[in-house]
Amino acid sequence: MTITAERPSATQDRGAEYLDRARAVAAVIESEANEIEATTTITPRAYQALADAGLFWILVPEEYGGAGLDIVSAFKVVQEISRADGSTGWAFMANSCSTGVAVGFMSPQGAQQVFGGPDKGITAGMVVPAGSGVRVDGGYRVNGRFRFASGSAHATWIGAGFVVHDENGDPVMRPDGQPDCQITWLPKEKVEFLGNWDVMGMVGTGSYDYRVDDQFVPDAVTFETFSTTPVLSLI
């Protein structure tokens, strides 16, 4: 009897490689677990281990310097990090998944701005439409208070979901009768963090509230909340 085995795909090979990286990083995270809980966020040492291993960008396509993993392989990495420390696993999941969504749905120009070059962006934040935005030339002016920004202490770009309003303060409606909702990303320095994460569980996720106060966001890093068609796909 002859048994024919299929050769693992390049994606599967990368998945195994990044899972091995996660196992190595997990040892560092486990040693930092007490400090992560004490400081309510991922420690600099744990962050650096995740970043050096390229794990924040497991869902970012290779053309932007990421791993380009499929979703199953990516969540095996998340599981491995979560096994070492639950809070770190949650924050890391929030970072890696939001980063994958951001690069997939924003314009190529925006993706290049955020993820191109040696200092690839890490995203975090609440993208449900809790804020408000007014259309201006080239983008929007956005305001709002947002909650539960897990992994935000080490993120470089912060997400904000908002409903578009007209000059009279009324929501702009789409042709289907639904409000025009958008997601955008701001450099971290344009966001005010409120430092109010004091909880019993998942302490180390750093899920702080934050405020966006009349900030301009360009179209290049903004996209429709309920779009189901990514600009860039891993498949």
Set out the residue ranges of the language-model regions.
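Basic/polar N-terminal segments that are highly enriched at the extreme N-terminus
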Residues: M1-D20, A24
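FAD-binding core of flavoproteins
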Residues: T123-I235
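Short secondary-structure boundary/capping elements
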Residues: E17, T41-I42
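Short, flexible segments with low predicted structural confidence
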Residues: D20-R23, A53, I183
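Glycine-rich flavin
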Residues: P44-D52, W57-T156, D166-D176
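N-terminal capping segment at the start of a domain
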Residues: V25-A33
